[in-house]
Amino acid sequence: MAEETQGADAVPQISFKKRTNKAKANFRKKPDTPPPASDSDSDFTSSDDEEGRRIKRRRKNAAVTASSTTAGPRRNVVEDQPATETAAIPLTSSNDATKHSNWYDEELSEKNLLGTTRARPASNTQSAPDGTYKGAANYSSFIQKNPNAPTKQFGPIKAPTNVRTVTVMDFAPDVCKDWKQTGFCGFGDSCKFLHAREDYKQGWELDREWEIGTKGKQLSGRVVSKRSGDAKTAEDDEDDDDEELLESIPFACIICKSSYKSPIVTKCGHYFCESCALQRYRKNPSCAACGAGTGGVFNVAKKLNHLLDKKRERARKLREQAIAEGEEVSSDEEGDEES
């Protein structure tokens, strides 16, 4: 009995609070469902049951009716809403102001273009052949390729950026001695020396000579050449042909390397001095220019004598004209006139 009384005392006592009339008056009720905007447009009818709930039923004979008021389009009016604050976008740093472009592709990197400086790997020892022929496709290649070599072998190659090269082109050519002395070279166009007779000087030498020659003098202009409107005559055409022929003929004998003395012409069309040709024929009957056999036939070069006479006459007139105008005459022009 004592245990039953202790268990009854352990159960808590619950009290229920009753709602007062004032509290019931303040209790909000759910409003009734409003009727639809137009019952005629719908195929359903509504009615209230005994408990006050609205019941919707489908009409059996539904008719479509339209009016001018309901035919207009319905517009959804959006009320103005206050602007809401958007989330701040985090700023990212970029190098747009200092960005630069490089025309080299990623594949054409410095390693691919220049390679590396590591030593070549040791060659792999292949197994000895067993003597069986396996066809041309199975031939072994003994060429050792460097894997560190640049892959690009053609086209523009990127130069190293840590090396700066300066190239200076100095025009100091090696002149062919035979061509300068005689106007003939046995190598022809394949000669590696320059075929020229002019004496070239550096720019500073020309400027220095000009300053020395014109220092303290008053420079006065004069007519160097005058363009004539007259047409060329037959004599001018003949002179041009003679000049072209003289350019194709060496201006000196290639044996004695001096001016022609009683010039003769061989069957192959080369010109020599008469004494030089006869003296060479005693030892070697071939031509000194091309090596062809002469057969002991040497004809007098009448046309060359005529051309040389005209050349000397023209040089003499030019020299006299230069002296009359007070110009200096070089030693080369005097030598040409005497020859």
UniProtKB/Swiss-Prot annotation:
Pfam families: zf-C3HC4_2 (PF13923), zf-CCCH (PF00642). Keywords: DNA-binding, Metal-binding, mRNA processing, mRNA splicing, Nucleus, Spliceosome, Zinc, Zinc-finger. A zinc finger (C3H1-type) spans 170-198. One of its GO terms (cellular component) is U2-type spliceosomal complex. GO terms for molecular function: DNA binding; zinc ion binding. Residues 1-102, 114-133, 221-243, 319-339 are annotated as: Disordered. PROSITE patterns: ZF_C3H1, ZF_RING_1, ZF_RING_2. It comes from the Eukaryota. It is found in: Nucleus. Its main location: nucleus. One of its GO terms (biological process) is mRNA processing. SUPFAM superfamilies: CCCH zinc finger, RING/U-box. A zinc finger (RING-type) spans 253-291. Associated with the spliceosome. Involved in pre-mRNA splicing. Belongs to the CWC24 family. This is Pre-mRNA-splicing factor cwc24. It comes from Aspergillus fumigatus (strain ATCC MYA-4609 / CBS 101355 / FGSC A1100 / Af293).
